[in-house]
Amino acid sequence: MNKEKLSDHLKSEWKKIDQTANPSIPNQKELLHQLSQMKAEYRKKLLQEIILFVFCALMVVSAAILAFTQAPAVFIVLQVCVLAVLPILIAAEKKRHLGECEVKRG
């Protein structure tokens, strides 16, 4: 009999939880709005990455041309600097990638 009371008590508590934790289901308009916001954020991030890539590519090409034509020592210093910064960039990219994998609620 003790198990039956416990079972009934748990069932009643579960019903209370179900009643209080009733999630709201968004309508089609809200879903479309959320989707358009996510697409806009994606486009903005993509554009930022493309601009950053082009800027970095131009800087690298300019520095390489300068190093090859003006001073080979500058080219060697540039290579050392890149090797020093590369682990930091890799760590930042891994951290950013892990942050994107987490589930965002809001």
Swiss-Prot record:
Disulfide bond residue pairs: none
GO cellular component: plasma membrane
Protein induction: Expression is sigma Y-dependent. Induced upon nitrogen starvation.
Keyword Transmembrane part of the UniProt annotation: yes
InterPro entries named among the record's database cross-references: DUF5345
Topological category with respect to the lipid bilayer: Multi-pass membrane protein
Transmembrane regions: 46-68, 73-92
Cell compartment(s), UniProt: Cell membrane
Name of the protein in question: Uncharacterized protein YxlC
